[in-house]
């Protein structure tokens, strides 16, 4: 069994990205990321702080717009419009989830697709589905980079994804299909998840339920990717996989923490750099 070490890989990618950003800055373009945080959800606040620190490490200018939880949808859309028109902001990220009175789809659709570094705009989702270059959601992108770094070729492989969220499951399914995998997606209405996972070459779990994937659900030598992040009452972070029992049976497996999480952050940084490169290209055409 080999651990898919996202933490060490993310450090390597950050080092390379820092050099690329420095070269970009020397041409007069400093990548800029605007993060919108609505309310004071502890998990959301922690994620935003992690993103800000990561931006600082690689040389990306980042600014966080903290909004009260009672902000109206129209007020939030106005903030996004200002950022859409700010020439110093290359990427716009709205931290999810949003309060119940705000329609998430409307907010995400308001972001300029060329600044949608989260890859959640329908325009970018559509481009991903037809395998055209676009912004790819950070977590699925991080999963693919992690597999690639360990020379795990998904072409012709049977892949099962448990979870069909717009953030992870669906875009990951598109990426896997684009890479030549045969993909099945299990969700809350799937009657027998084990029936799908027991013969899969690669199993990706992104649900948010402790111990969802047990050892009897995978075949010997399967690759297991755990996207779940759950905090136990003791404060310990665990994923969706029964790691202790699944790991000995797998050929590769991601730990939690230290697997997919760091790759999500670094993929966001790469998307922001990509958006800044677009700005430079536009400037050079003038």
Swiss-Prot record:
The keyword Glycosyltransferase does not apply. It comes from the Bacteria. GO terms for molecular function: methenyltetrahydrofolate cyclohydrolase activity; methylenetetrahydrofolate dehydrogenase (NADP+) activity. Gene3D superfamilies: Leucine Dehydrogenase, chain A, domain 1, NAD(P)-binding Rossmann-like Domain. InterPro entries: Aminoacid_DH-like_N_sf (IPR046346), NAD(P)-bd_dom_sf (IPR036291), THF_DH/CycHdrlase (IPR000672), THF_DH/CycHdrlase_cat_dom (IPR020630), THF_DH/CycHdrlase_CS (IPR020867), THF_DH/CycHdrlase_NAD-bd_dom (IPR020631). It catalyses: (6R)-5,10-methylene-5,6,7,8-tetrahydrofolate + NADP(+) = (6R)-5,10-methenyltetrahydrofolate + NADPH; (6R)-5,10-methenyltetrahydrofolate + H2O = (6R)-10-formyltetrahydrofolate + H(+). One of its GO terms (biological process) is purine nucleotide biosynthetic process. NCBIfam families: PRK10792.1, PRK14191.1. Homodimer. HAMAP family: THF_DHG_CYH (MF_01576). This is Bifunctional protein FolD. It comes from Helicobacter hepaticus (strain ATCC 51449 / 3B1).
């Amino acid at each position: 069994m080999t651990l898919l070490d996202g933490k060490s890989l993310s450090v390597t990618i950050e080092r390379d990205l820092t050099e690329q950003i420095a070269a970009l800055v020397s041409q007069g373009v400093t990548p800029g990321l605007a993060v919108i945080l609505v309310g004071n959800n502890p998990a959301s606040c922690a994620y935003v702080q992690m993103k800000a620190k990561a931006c600082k490490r690689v040389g990306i200018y980042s600014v966080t717009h903290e909004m009260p939880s009672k902000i109206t949808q129209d007020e939030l859309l106005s903030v996004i419009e200002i950022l859409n028109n700010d020439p110093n902001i290359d990427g716009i990220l709205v931290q999810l989830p949003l309060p119940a009175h705000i329609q998430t789809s409307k907010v995400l659709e308001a972001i300029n697709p060329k600044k949608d570094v989260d890859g959640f705009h329908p325009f970018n989702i559509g481009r991903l589905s037809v395998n055209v270059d676009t912004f790819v959601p950070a977590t699925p992108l991080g999963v693919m980079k992690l597999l690639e770094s360990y020379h795990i070729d998904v072409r012709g492989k049977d892949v099962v994804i448990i979870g069909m969220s717009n953030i992870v499951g669906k875009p990951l399914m598109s990426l896997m299909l684009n890479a030549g995998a045969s993909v099945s997606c299990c969700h809350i209405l799937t009657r027998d998840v084990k029936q799908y996972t027991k013969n899969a070459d690669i199993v990706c779990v992104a649900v948010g339920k402790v111990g969802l994937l047990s050892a009897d659900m995978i075949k010997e030598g399967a690759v297991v990717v755990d996207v779940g992040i759950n905090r136990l009452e003791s404060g310990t972070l665990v994923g969706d996989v029964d790691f202790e029992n699944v790991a000995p049976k797998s050929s590769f497996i991601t730990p939690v923490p230290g697997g997919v999480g760091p790759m999500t952050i670094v993929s966001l940084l790469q998307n922001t750099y990509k958006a800044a490169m677009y700005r430079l290209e536009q400037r050079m055409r003038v």
